[in-house]
Amino acid sequence: MMVCLDRNTCLKMYELITEKWQLAIELQEKELVEEEIIHCHDPDILDEKRKHLAWMKETKFAVVVSSEQSEIEEVAKFNDHSGKPLDILKHRKLMQERKLDEEFKDSNNPLGFVIVCAMWLTGFDVKSLSTLYIDKPMQNHTLMQAIARANRVAPGKKQGTIIDYN
């Protein structure tokens, strides 16, 4: 989970993260093919790499933010890192059509990373959440609630990690 300063930052981070994620998948695919053909590594290591690559391909991302009147027009005034206008429609549609909160709580669901600005920071318990990225100034109760997200106990979870960019 990543906590961003505002809705537009969430949308920009989504674009950046998913773009980099896809590049990482392509790089791992290339490396795996090279190792299978050229280097003929240990089959167990190759199997682990195949599993990791499959997990990367299955992992889904979502932006979860509160809706506002005239948000489509407001968001479109800003550009992403490549210069294209930001678009909240695909994210809003996803939030309306699916129960993203339930999906994210299910550790077997491919929804593995959400980007939020205020939603889900208080009163939202995801025991399996292991890493929280904070890119937003927070204090008092909101900060404690956010930190608590990564500190829940869950089967197979050894620790929680908090990365604060502020």
Residue ranges of model-derived segments:
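Conserved C-terminal RecA-like helicase domain
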Residues: M1-F113
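Switch/connector loops and helix/strand junctions flanking conserved nucleotide-binding motifs
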Residues: C10-K12, S70-V75, F124-D125, N140-Q145, ...
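Short, well-ordered loop/turn and helix-capping segments at boundaries between secondary-structure elements
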Residues: E19, L23, D135, R149-G156
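Catalytic micro-motifs at enzyme active sites that drive phosphoryl/nucleotidyl and oxygen chemistry
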Residues: R50, M119, A150-N151
